[in-house]
Amino acid sequence: MPEISRDEVAHLAKLSRLALTDEELDRFAEQIDGIIGNVSAVQQVAAEGVEPMSHPHSIKTTMREDVVEQILTPEQALDQAPAVDQQRFVVPQILGEQD
């Protein structure tokens, strides 16, 4: 069974900008290890001769004509925005990184 280390979980948490306690690191390492084990078990299933599918039932897609209706101008769309720059919404920076 594959094993993911506590350090690997800590690395993933850091990349995801998550602050995890020692208990959470241990618990998530165990849970991720279980998930990887389940995926490995599924990969072992003999699927020769089975045609690939996206869904077990036949699904029909209903098509309709694409009709252009009245749309907003850029000015109308941005009219109520608190901050705009070059016809774009200005939002607060989330991750603290700069370009």
From Swiss-Prot:
Single GO MF annotation: glutaminyl-tRNA synthase (glutamine-hydrolyzing) activity
Name of the gene: gatC
The protein's role, per its UniProt record: Allows the formation of correctly charged Asn-tRNA(Asn) or Gln-tRNA(Gln) through the transamidation of misacylated Asp-tRNA(Asn) or Glu-tRNA(Gln) in organisms which lack either or both of asparaginyl-tRNA or glutaminyl-tRNA synthetases. The reaction takes place in the presence of glutamine and ATP through an activated phospho-Asp-tRNA(Asn) or phospho-Glu-tRNA(Gln).
Top-level taxon: Bacteria
Upper lineage: Bacteria, Bacillati, Actinomycetota, Actinomycetes, Mycobacteriales
The entry's keywords: ATP-binding, Ligase, Nucleotide-binding, Protein biosynthesis
Name recorded for this polypeptide: Aspartyl/glutamyl-tRNA(Asn/Gln) amidotransferase subunit C
Biological process (GO), any one: glutaminyl-tRNAGln biosynthesis via transamidation
This protein's record includes keyword RNA-binding: no
UniProt EC number: 6.3.5.-
Subunit and partners: Heterotrimer of A, B and C subunits.
One Pfam family named in its UniProt record: GatC
Catalyses which reaction(s): L-glutamyl-tRNA(Gln) + L-glutamine + ATP + H2O = L-glutaminyl-tRNA(Gln) + L-glutamate + ADP + phosphate + H(+); L-aspartyl-tRNA(Asn) + L-glutamine + ATP + H2O = L-asparaginyl-tRNA(Asn) + L-glutamate + ADP + phosphate + 2 H(+)
Top EC class of this enzyme: ligase
InterPro entries assigned to the protein according to its UniProt record, in alphabetical order: Asp/Glu-ADT_sf_sub_c (IPR036113), GatC (IPR003837)
Similarity field: Belongs to the GatC family.
